[in-house]
């Protein structure tokens, strides 16, 4: 998908930031140019990201002698430093126009990609109103569509509000059962009804209404979980390496909560030559099984089908 991180972060900086962009980015430029010491975690993350090894440019950066860069070695990123310098000096145009954009377009053309110069030039971020519910006297707000995580979370809270959780031990099997059933219903709301609101009329108010939650809560049984026939066989699932989150509070009390992702760890694994930029793999978040009547997952959601200019549904909140 068209990279949106640079535009979004710079838009936030323009609206809310105090420091000059050059000052904000200089430490990052220095770090990319001078290098970082490869940690145990970074070494293992590279080794577990099969997609990195498939891309010639990524192999040059992240591998030595066909093995992940060694723990304790110095990893320098001169191309990435140049890209950050362009952004530092030219802002959004330093990424979405000029030599960086040309290299992205050239790489897309050489490898059968879909992003062209028009996609980059026309990209813009959007500020959207949060969505929220009242949960036991507390106002809870989160991100709305095209992010789907907020719908999941708020639906689950609404469902749980119909149960007196204080009656049960917090670590009891019944508590976990109710949490699981509430989240399942939240995922059901997300998977079938969420997409880019500029292209699809997402029934957000209805999805997170108390009336909808009451209906969803009615068929939760205290005695049993879902039928065994509807439960997939066990697959060992490790903690996801997909996404990064950070929260920052400054001396004036201003708070930033940022969840950021390339999709998978290291995204698509494809590095644009000469820029150090890793491309995301967010196209997988579209409904790539749209029209498949046997699918009940978000992969077939009518609200999230492929359309030009559309933003894919995000699972984050």
Language-model features: where?
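Noncatalytic scaffold domains of N-terminal-nucleophile
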Residues: 1-91, 95-144, 148, 208, ...
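Active-site rim segments in enzyme catalytic domains, especially the processed small/beta chain
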Residues: 114-116, 254-317
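Internal maturation/activation junctions in enzymes
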Residues: 163-262, 275
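Short, well-ordered loop/turn and helix-capping segments at boundaries between secondary-structure elements
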Residues: 12-18, 30, 34, 106, ...
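Glycine-rich phosphate/pyrophosphate-binding beta-alpha loops
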Residues: 141-150, 243-247, 259-271
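Short, small/polar residue-rich loop motifs at catalytic or cofactor-binding pockets
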Residues: 127, 240-243, 265, 316
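Short loop/turn motifs at secondary-structure junctions and domain boundaries
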Residues: 53, 123-124, 236-241, 312
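Extended, domain-scale alpha-helical bundle/helix-rich regions
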Residues: 149-155, 185
């Amino acid at each position: 998908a068209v990279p949106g991180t640079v535009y979004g972060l710079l838009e936030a900086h323009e609206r809310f930031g105090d420091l000059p962009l050059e000052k904000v980015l200089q430490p990052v430029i220095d770090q990319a140019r001078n290098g970082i010491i490869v940690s145990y975690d970074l070494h293992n993350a590279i080794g577990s990201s099969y997609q990195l090894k498939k891309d010639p440019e990524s192999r040059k950066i992240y591998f030595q002698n066909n093995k992940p860069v060694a723990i304790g070695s110095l990893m320098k990123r001169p191309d990435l430093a140049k890209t950050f310098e362009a952004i530092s000096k030219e802002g959004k145009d330093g990424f979405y126009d000029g030599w960086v954009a040309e290299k992205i377009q050239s790489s897309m053309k050489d490898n059968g990609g879909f992003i062209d110069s028009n996609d980059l030039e026309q990209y813009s971020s959007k500020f959207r109103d949060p969505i929220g519910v009242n949960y036991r006297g507390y106002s809870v707000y989160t991100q709305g569509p095209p992010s789907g995580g907020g719908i999941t979370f708020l639906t689950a809270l609404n469902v749980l509000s119909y149960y007196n959780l204080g009656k049960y031990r917090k670590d009891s099997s019944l508590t976990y059962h109710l949490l699981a059933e509430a989240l399942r219903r939240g995922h059901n709301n997300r998977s079938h009804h969420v997409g880019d609101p500029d292209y699809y009329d997402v029934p957000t108010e209805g999805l997170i209404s108390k009336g909808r939650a009451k209906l969803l809560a009615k068929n939760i049984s205290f005695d049993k979980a879902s039928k065994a026939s509807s439960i997939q066989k066990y697959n060992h699932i490790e903690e996801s390496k997909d996404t990064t989150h950070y929260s920052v509070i400054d001396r004036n009390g201003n708070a930033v909560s940022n969840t950021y992702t390339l999709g998978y760890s290291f995204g698509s694994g494809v590095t644009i030559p000469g820029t150090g930029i890793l491309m995301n793999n967010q196209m997988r978040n579209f409904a790539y099984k749209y029209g498949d009547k046997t699918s009940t997952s978000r992969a077939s959601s009518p609200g999230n089908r492929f359309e030009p200019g559309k933003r894919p549904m995000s699972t984050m909140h």
